[in-house]
């Protein structure tokens, strides 16, 4: 069930459905596509001002590249994850991976990912990696 724009994505994509048409940004999509095609690319970070469309750009690019990742494309929304300790379970949830009590969660996640070729979007990861502000928010 794919359409080039205004698509409703199938479950195999593991991406949120986009109900609006994606317009423009072909240069950015081409650059991201090129970088992800590099065999040495294990991590790609999109940076920009909040609200500039990084998430939508990542989702559109992932949807277009889906067939190049035989084990799928996944989206892990991390804005609601309150602490770094909960990062691994949040990623596992996005991957539909059930963590058991046998090994450490991080080990289970790494073992799961090790032999797979997939694209994983970690949205809002930076909020879990940055130190807390020195002053309280008002």
What are these regions (language model features)?
Residues 3-129, 136-138:
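Walker A/P-loop phosphate-binding element recognition
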